Amino acid sequence: MKVRPSVKKICPKCKVIRRKGVLRVICDNPRHKQRQG
């Protein structure tokens, strides 16, 4: 999980979703997991 000021899709399978007001990237590749905050 990377915590970044701006989250971006890294590959076509990445999805940006909002959970409890936090932007997250979920992906099949665990190295692509990110969250904003």
UniProtKB/Swiss-Prot annotation:
GO terms for molecular function: structural constituent of ribosome. Keywords: Ribonucleoprotein, Ribosomal protein. It comes from the Bacteria. GO terms for cellular component: cytoplasm; ribonucleoprotein complex; ribosome. Pfam families: Ribosomal_L36. The keyword Ribosomal protein applies. One of its GO terms (biological process) is translation. The keyword Nucleotidyltransferase does not apply. Belongs to the bacterial ribosomal protein bL36 family. HAMAP family: Ribosomal_bL36 (MF_00251). PANTHER family: 50S RIBOSOMAL PROTEIN L36, CHLOROPLASTIC, LARGE RIBOSOMAL SUBUNIT PROTEIN BL36C. This is Large ribosomal subunit protein bL36. It comes from Maridesulfovibrio salexigens (strain ATCC 14822 / DSM 2638 / NCIMB 8403 / VKM B-1763).
